[in-house]
Amino acid sequence: MEKKTANDVVTLARAQDRLTTLEYIEAIFEDFLEFHGDRYFADDLAVVGGVATLQGKPVTVVGIQKGRNLPENIERNFGSPNPEGYRKALRLMKQAEKFNRPVITFVNTAGAYCGIGAEERGEGEAIAQNLLEMSDLKVPIISVIIGEGGSGGALALAVADEVWMLEHTIYAVLSPEGFASILWKDGSRAKEAAELMKITATELKELAIVDKVIPEVMNGQPLEQAKINRMLQKAFISKLTELAKLDTETLLEKRYQRFRKY
């Protein structure tokens, strides 16, 4: 199979048939109980989360939810969270800390919502607060990019002990279209921009920005989704078992150094 270009990966990352956060939760975890609302303003349906079990042990799972079709995407705001979505995520993560549950996040967003209402309600502050709190959260955190990882809207759920990416996903400070518009004043050069930006899982693993790439193709053939789900489940169990052996001080120091090295 011919090697995929960065633009090919962008297309695959945005594909509407990619599994959503809720579908991964259903496939990997048991006993999921969804929580709603940020306790300040509203329940942002672009962010989902709650408590589940993994191999019989409680975990908190949080993720950004896109829709499968136009009505679902309208309901989920096309996976672009408002500030109340990030505040809901933080509420669940602080609850996880209180009850000593590890946190697993799933990221798939083009970026945080940039509407007037979102800005008025403190979109930037909500993202910044998540970065601050996650950096010092006293339980293990694993973040997985399952589609698009766009800008601060993605990073707000990805300050983790380990960040993983599925093979055909992207993680970037902005979209290739945005990059081309800013650099060349020509959004039509997005394909060219994608090749320069180093946004694919393979490139980011080489740069040590991400810690693990979950394969979606093996021996030139697409892997069955069920096999990808099993790989993720086993990897979660293995890594959480490893992180659970660390005392809190060591866990936080390693997390700090992980981001400090950039």
From Swiss-Prot:
Coiled coil ranges: none
Highest taxon of source: Bacteria
Main location as per UniProt: cytoplasm
Any GO molecular function: ATP binding
SUPFAM superfamilies: ClpP/crotonase (SSF52096)
Keyword Cytoplasm: yes
A cellular-component GO term for this protein: acetyl-CoA carboxylase complex
E.C. code: 2.1.3.15
InterPro entries per record: Acetyl_CoA_COase_a_su, ClpP/crotonase-like_dom_sf, COA_CT_C
Ranges where the CoA carboxyltransferase C-terminal domain occurs: 1-242
Catalytic activity, reaction form: N(6)-carboxybiotinyl-L-lysyl-[protein] + acetyl-CoA = N(6)-biotinyl-L-lysyl-[protein] + malonyl-CoA
GO BP annotations, alphabetical order: fatty acid biosynthetic process; malonyl-CoA biosynthetic process
Assembly and oligomerization: Acetyl-CoA carboxylase is a heterohexamer composed of biotin carboxyl carrier protein (AccB), biotin carboxylase (AccC) and two subunits each of ACCase subunit alpha (AccA) and ACCase subunit beta (AccD).
HAMAP family registered for this protein in UniProt: AcetylCoA_CT_alpha (MF_00823)
Function: Component of the acetyl coenzyme A carboxylase (ACC) complex. First, biotin carboxylase catalyzes the carboxylation of biotin on its carrier protein (BCCP) and then the CO(2) group is transferred by the carboxyltransferase to acetyl-CoA to form malonyl-CoA.
Family: Belongs to the AccA family.
NCBIfam families referenced in this protein's UniProt entry, alphabetically: accA, AccA_sub, PRK05724.1, PRK12319.1
Protein name: Acetyl-coenzyme A carboxylase carboxyl transferase subunit alpha
Organism, as annotated: Enterococcus faecalis (strain ATCC 700802 / V583)
Gene name of this polypeptide: accA
